[in-house]
A protein has these predicted regions:
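Phosphate/nucleotide-binding beta-alpha loop and adjacent structural elements of enzyme active sites
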Residues: 1-197
Length: 197
């Protein structure tokens, strides 16, 4: 799905675990763009990536501007534009780790769309990875034009399953689970799903 020289857009980079894999796959001739709005995560992301990666200090959605962004202070694993998602995940993290406090705080972040970022940066991504903790549908709605030329995506689907599948099927994508099994057109699985043309 990702070849040497490709351009990858990673939406939700956290601290760069997956970004490093993308760097290896695209090689020295490829490009990786990673959107990460959280200052704490971005600090470590910058330390973990190489010179062929461009860090975009923004969130991606279906609008441009400035929005509230919710951060759980356990490790930043469930930071999101969707407050309910972060609050629910924060409670689960608190219980699973026997922590007495897992705070959720709200910050303001710059927001843009994939279509506008692709145009501004002059890129045509071959592959897009979306891991945005409940905001997947909004990100995809902001990528209507870009999706026409994308070869493949990996979307971690947390909610809005049916709408996400319908949007991507309209764009002629097929869906596979991470184990490689093709999904039937009526099957709307969650988790990490690969879409390809």
């Amino acid at each position: 799905m990702i070849n040497d020289g490709d351009c990858v857009l990673e939406v939700g980079g956290h601290i760069g675990y997956v970004t490093q894999i993308f760097e290896d796959l695209v090689g020295g001739n490829g490009l990786v763009y990673v959107a990460e709005p959280t200052p704490f995560s971005r600090y470590f992301l910058a330390k973990n990536v190489s010179s062929n990666t461009t860090i975009l200090p923004i969130a991606l959605s279906d609008v441009s501007g400035n929005m509230d962004f919710y951060i759980e202070e356990f490790g930043g694993f469930t930071n999101s534009l969707v407050s309910e998602f972060t609050e629910t995940s924060s409670k689960w993290l608190k219980a699973s780790q026997n922590k007495s406090v897992t705070e959720v705080k709200k910050i303001k972040v710059d927001v843009n769309t994939i279509d506008l970022v692709s145009k501004r940066e002059g890129i045509t991504p071959n592959f897009i990875k979306i891991d945005v903790e409940g905001a997947e549908l909004s990100v995809l709605k902001g990528a209507e034009k870009t999706l026409l030329s994308v070869d493949a995506l990996m979307v971690e689907i947390s909610q809005d399953h049916e709408e996400i599948y319908e949007l991507l099927y309209r764009k002629k994508f097929k869906a596979k689970k991470k184990n490689g099994n093709l999904l039937a057109s009526h099957e709307h699985a969650g988790g990490n799903i690969f879409f390809y043309k």
